[in-house]
Curated annotation (Swiss-Prot):
The gene is gltX. Its cofactor is Zn(2+). This is Glutamate--tRNA ligase. It comes from the Bacteria. Its main location: cytoplasm. Catalyzes the attachment of glutamate to tRNA(Glu) in a two-step reaction: glutamate is first activated by ATP to form Glu-AMP and then transferred to the acceptor end of tRNA(Glu). Monomer.
Amino acid sequence: MANANSPKSSTPLGEGVPPRVRFCPSPTGNPHVGLVRTALFNWAFARHTGGTFVFRIEDTDAARDSEESYEQLLDSLRWLGFDWDEGPGVGGPHAPYRQSQRMDLYKDVAQKLLDGGYAYHCYCSTEELDTRRDAARAAGKPSGYDGHCRELSAEQKAAYEAEGRTPIVRFRMPDEPITFTDLVRGDITYLPENVPDYGIVRANGAPLYTLVNPVDDALMEITHVLRGEDLLSSTPRQVALYRALIELGIAKSVPEFGHLPYVMGEGNKKLSKRDPQASLNLYRERGFLPEGLLNYLSLLGWSLSADRDIFTIDEMVAAFDVKDVNPNPARFDLKKCEAINADHIRLLDVKDFTERCRPWLKAPFANWAPEDFDEAKWQVIAPYAQSRLKVLSEITDNVDFLFLPEPVFDEASWTKAMKEGSDALLRTAREKLEAADWTSPESLKEAVLAAGEEHGLKLGKAQAPVRVAVTGRTVGLPLFESLEILGKEKTLARVDAALAKLTA
């Protein structure tokens, strides 16, 4: 057998070869933001270099994979604005792009690895492996597979099979160090004692991820593998396997690897897909803009410039180079994510903003009757709302006072604003508002300011009871513009209702 670690087995990529990258998630559960960050960096790299973005589905885990998760994954990627050059719904020269439909390919490659001496059958039972592993640990030695079945004779194999043992297939790792240059982390070397032979096919004949992932990359001619740091330790295994596949004529080259930094959650722990803030669906349901979320995720390991956090996806694509990715862990900061999304909301054309808010202006989010929604009022209030929101879902609570017959009082807001003397202030404010010019927010402001002065209050203190009386909350859109849009009759009626509640 040829040495799978020999330099001649690694064919370098030719100059000017357009990169081919892949994104290959498993359809299990809800998509998470770490997965999106990986997709984003691969997609941006492909678009920046004029390369090919391959979307592949790793659906060989029948117990965990589901068609529902698969459809949700496709929908999420489309919502984010990702397009792919090859993959589900698009096709391509290396179809099919679902691993569950490629099983015969993997079995064929596994047999070629066996025939070429790059792999072998292992008959060790789980109990035997555990016993030898424990003994190695006790002796202070590496606890990986010890090569027990590496050189079995035909007689030994026959004896094991006579016992009813069904073997797995293990890949034979070279007895030399494996070095590769990581695009993010530089040169990395693994010693042979730390990378033992590993399983590639289960005893039932099912190929493992350790085989199918590199085989698909080889057959699809992937040139760059950009993935999470958690997969770094598997890279020497895959490099050795690629070299074997090259010698078998299956692969053309070993791809370049770039391992992206961990995304950290709270408490200095890696953000897990089980963490509530990791779920992509959460951000979509809250009304994050795709461009705002992607802008923030791009900052988890990369930056456009030291003094600029807000940019478009086109600007990111124009500047993105995987070699600029920072290898240090990146912390997910929800408040910063919201702030960046708020900036992107403000960058929208007003008409675009009004349309993107539509889902939150009707059931199940809106708490008003459909017939009470007033399109004309919505069009007028929208620009004021646009400058205040962090996420689109906040629009409902900010404008409900316009469409409800009467405000829904937030109890905390009522307690905070309606202090002793608020009834007298509201009576004075009502008188002055009734006499004000209702075509001018400035006139309404002057009315409340004058009412406050009569009671020894500055505008901020004077307007708080008025705001709660009319909108039900202490915080909201610009008050006097809101009063003008609501109208004189409804505003005064709500002040009267608040006075009745105060004096009840």
